[in-house]
């Protein structure tokens, strides 16, 4: 058994796994039968364990390592900040925090002026909801069934998927169906029909819930964990129009889709819409240090000039996280990482995935933007029957064994590599998909 050296001590995968299972309590799982993958290190788009096994990362972990692992510029900025000031309370003014906020505001469309920093996407959504309620004096929040907004009180209640059910204690949350033409709730046959019917349905929800009671509509610009559900043309503009008509704050969750993932700094830019609040995390500094935030439009920022904002976090704007944000944004600009996500995603990855769909009947649909793509796997294209959990687990295991880390959710594979990935690495990943799908061809009826 090959052993890696860690802090001058030989370490094996088994030792690390045993330590984990003895003391670590994992999220979203039953603890008894867990067998976590052991990771020792990473660089760029690749990871490895303590025994020499390597993987190409097509997951970006939880869709956050947009700039790749161990980027030297980000590491250097973090080291410099460590030597200057490692922590400071959020009530102070700090250079790293101010520079990070300015860079984020500068990336946004005209009309945004302030950033409230959090530690992750969940508390970003939590505080955006709080801002909307304080700003409007209203209570209700509308959000989609096909969504995930985080695992804190209001964020998990706003979430639409199964994870909200055992945690649904927060008040004032109403859910609605967002567009998903492949499995339309509106019996639509075209994107235009899906858009029109989804907007008409949302209008009725607003009317029935009482417009003067609704503080916010919270949507992911492109629902991520729910399936990378790219909204049909005109839908987001229609939601913006409804929000304007009824005086509702529009919050767009860019936690997963933002900071280059779709080939633009913010996914909503491609839909021709500007929200009132934007929540972000993940790609803002690639998860090197936990960070998130709320990007605040000028009218809402001005409101809190003379109205008290009842919210805060001990580690809001942590200097180490802020230094990582500044370096990440600067490096992404200079190295044209966002442009790479657009070109590699739309011109290399997407055509490659579509070619796989032509070859393998278990692929029911390919969808996405940039390096935010999804494969929906089915046993019957005609019936759109999802592959079972057991089948998906087997496919995920085969991909891992072949050297590819995949992001698997229900019957889908989300193809979301770091935004620094090369065409050659995409070809390598597509070849692994091809070989594994061929092994499971019998699943398609």
Predicted feature residues:
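Conserved N-terminal phosphate-binding loop of PLP-dependent enzymes in the Aspartate aminotransferase
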Residues: 1-445
